[in-house]
A protein has these predicted regions:
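Bacterial N-terminal signal peptides
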Residues: 19-31
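Bacterial N-terminal signal peptides that target proteins for export
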Residues: 6-21
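Substrate-recognition element of Asp-dependent hydrolases with the DxDx(T/V) motif
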Residues: 115, 154-196, 243-245
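Active-site neighborhood of HAD-like aspartate-dependent phosphohydrolases
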Residues: 106, 117-159, 163
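Surface-exposed patches in mature extracellular/periplasmic domains of secreted proteins
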Residues: 84-101, 166-173, 204-209, 241
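C-terminal cap/substrate-recognition subdomain and adjoining C-terminal extension
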Residues: 179-316
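Second-shell loop/turn segments in exported
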Residues: 58-67, 140-148, 170-183, 214-218
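Non-catalytic pre-domain segments flanking phosphatase-related domains
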Residues: 32-111, 289-316
Length: 316
């Protein structure tokens, strides 16, 4: 019988296999194995719009989101007969006011609109699919559709608050083109009112209940204190609901008065979850875009800022 091909003469096959296995074992014990390859980081951040996909899907598909929203509004409905019914106010703009004067005022509940009453995750999904960020033109087109659905639990709470005798004000940073607010010429305002009426919220078709940014000259900014002050001059504000800290108080004021104001959450203030956008996100990307930057470059700068602020390690 001839010698097997490739085997050195005079060396049994079993002995050679044992030598190879032994060499491998020695190498492993000595730590001479090749180091694990670390995959390089991507050369560029994800496509514009992609970073909102998980948040949008969570709000559209997750049972946890629906449960969270219904839980907030369920608590608010329970509070209608306890803390909301008690003397006092939910508005920082009315704190320090004469108690007897407040007691004589009719009562009101102020709610934010987008992601508090109206679910705009469909708009966010469209922007993600298009690989684009928010812009005024696409947002205006979405508002004109009047197709937003209700945030889970919102309609039932508002109906209960209305039955309890509270007027509902819808305070929103939606706005009309300059020179048209708040008249019938503002198509987006009319579409918003139709949207609210179709959902069956109390007073949703009444234009006087919709307080948009820019409806009055002094309501020009995105801050909401001036509009709450307008309501506070006419009503005792017994509850606030929103998805952003600015729906309740200025962020800087809350930081100064946190110990004093925090107990209002869950008693007169009711905060809805929104991971898609908000003043928290604007604070993160503030300053990443510079004057003259085009939209694509600005979007890329915003994404780069977000990645730079990710914290991979807990503080020791």
């Amino acid at each position: 019988m001839g010698q097997p091909r490739g085997q050195p003469r005079g060396q049994p096959i079993a002995h050679r296999r044992g030598s190879v296995i032994g060499a491998l074992l020695l190498c492993a014990l000595a730590g001479c194995a090749a180091p694990l390859r670390v995959q390089p980081s991507p050369a560029a951040p994800p496509l514009v719009g992609r970073e909102t996909v998980n948040a949008t899907l969570w709000m559209q598909r997750a049972a946890e989101y629906r449960i969270s929203a219904e839980q907030v509004y369920g608590l608010a409905a329970e509070r209608l007969t306890t803390t909301i019914a008690a003397p006092g106010t939910a508005a920082v703009e009315q704190q320090g006011a004469d108690a007897a004067t407040l007691a004589r005022l009719p009562t009101a509940v102020i709610v934010d609109l987008d992601e508090t009453i109206l679910d705009n995750s469909f708009y966010q999904a469209r922007r993600a699919l298009a690989g684009a960020e928010f812009d005024d033109a696409s947002w205006d087109a979405w508002m004109l559709e009047g197709a937003a659905t209700a945030v889970p639990g919102a309609v039932a709470f508002l109906q209960a608050a209305s039955r309890a005798g509270h007027r509902i004000f819808y305070l929103t940073n939606r706005s009309c083109p300059r020179g048209t607010a708040p008249g019938a010429a503002c198509a987006s305002r009319a579409a918003t009112l139709r949207n609210l009426a179709a959902l069956g919220v109390p007073g949703g078709a009444d234009s006087d209940n919709l307080l948009q940014r820019g409806d009055r000259p002094e309501w020009n900014g995105s801050e909401k204190s001036s509009r709450r002050t307008w309501v506070a001059e006419r009503y005792r504000i017994v509850a606030l609901a929103g998805d952003d800290l600015h729906d309740f108080v200025d962020r800087a004021e809350y930081a100064r008065r946190r110990a004093e104001l925090a107990p209002l959450f869950g008693t007169r203030w009711f905060l809805l979850p929104n991971a898609m956008y908000g003043s928290w996100e604007r604070a993160i990307v503030s300053g990443s875009c510079t004057p003259g930057m085009d939209a694509a470059t600005c979007a890329a700068a915003n994404i780069a800022r977000k990645y730079a602020l990710l914290d991979p390690a807990p503080a020791l």
